[in-house]
């Protein structure tokens, strides 16, 4: 039972993280993040402490053309998570920055998901994401994986209860004498 639960947890974590694009770039290079194909894309830079910024509001460091985001002259401070959405679909990127002496591996882009830093608090960003989900016509990979894990967990629980009630036979002679009422 414990090994099954561990397997399910690891599978769901792998499903959640597989949707994010991981890009490795070197210091001093330029990096372009492709946005969703829909309308105008809004980009967010997400920090580990829950704050986020709009990179397009910093024209010297970033270039936005309405869909793509280009990080100009990448520095070590540019590592982290970038989130682009057109409120119908979204893409997430995890930027890993290497020193310029280390050659960067080729860019590999997968389908993406979420991540955040600005002077606006985390609840505001959560409200923004809720609005994004409400306007979306597709279900994200993370939502599907969470639903699958919950369904499997409930199935295991129902199976365990059914097994206990059907297969456990109580010996008639063993019983608590205080609970017997032989009159």
UniProtKB/Swiss-Prot annotation:
InterPro entries in the cross-refs: Adeno_E3_CR1, Adeno_E3_CR2, Ig-like_dom_sf
Keywords: Early protein, Glycoprotein
Family matches, as SUPFAM superfamilies: Immunoglobulin (SSF48726)
Record has Cell membrane as a keyword: no
Region forming the signal peptide: none
Pfam families: Adeno_E3_CR1, Adeno_E3_CR2
Sites carrying sugar chains: 30, 73, 117, 134-135
Top-level division of the source organism's lineage: Viruses
Family assignment from sequence similarity: Belongs to the adenoviridae E3_20 family.
Name the record gives this protein: Early E3 20.2 kDa glycoprotein
